[in-house]
Amino acid sequence: MDTKRVGILVVDLSQWGRKEHFEAFQSFAQCTFSQTVQLDITSLLKTVKQNGYKFYPTFIYIISLLVNKHAEFRMAMKDGELVIWDSVNPGYNIFHEQTETFSSLWSYYHKDINRFLKTYSEDIAQYGDDLAYFPKEFIENMFFVSANPWVSFTSFNLNMANINNFFAPVFTIGKYYTQGDKVLMPLAIQVHHAVCDGFHVGRLLNEIQQYCDEGCK
């Protein structure tokens, strides 16, 4: 039986439907996998403009909202146990033009978009000029978003030296571009196969596209 504790749910592996998959991808078949799609953000850009939002934090919010819907993207190893965080917060990169480096910042997730965007703006105001890699105290319950707005791409992969027990999904956003009457944007996701499969990634990517189509309604 799964056990509830403050902030987490401890998974009872003996009762988990993915027990064998988890054990396989934690041992002899340990791996991550990546998938890249070209999102249609035409409607989303219109919504962002109409509401006076900024695109980057708006898209971070969309990913955060949908990631938090699914347990497989909130999993982690904690004190030797597989757990599911009650919620996860987005970590994201901030580029510093003067040094051509970046910082890894994070903001608390809020389901309400305006509250999240306010929190994001406050964090940028406080930490945005700090050149440290981690300008803000690190927390455990995070996933990660990065942006490479200088180029578009059709494939993206992170080659991690040590993937053991790193279950947080990593998203990478590319430069958006016009194709016909649409605006498309590359989005890559990398996940650990121990906690999710192609089905889960496909469902999430389809939900992100649907949310973009509906314009944050």
Swiss-Prot record:
Q: Does the keyword NAD apply?
A: no
* Protein name according to UniProt: Chloramphenicol acetyltransferase
Catalytic activity from the UniProt record: chloramphenicol + acetyl-CoA = chloramphenicol 3-acetate + CoA
Q: Which SUPFAM superfamilies match?
A: CoA-dependent acyltransferases (SSF52777)
Q: What biological-process GO terms show up in the record? A: response to antibiotic
On subunit structure and binding partners, the annotation says: Homotrimer.
Q: From what superkingdom does this record's organism come?
A: Bacteria
Q: Which protein family is named in the record?
A: Belongs to the chloramphenicol acetyltransferase family.
Function, in words: This enzyme is an effector of chloramphenicol resistance in bacteria.
Keyword tags: Acyltransferase, Antibiotic resistance, Transferase
| Enzyme Commission number | 2.3.1.28
Write down the InterPro entries for this protein, in alphabetical order: CAT-like_dom_sf, Chloramphenicol_AcTrfase_AS, Cmp_AcTrfase
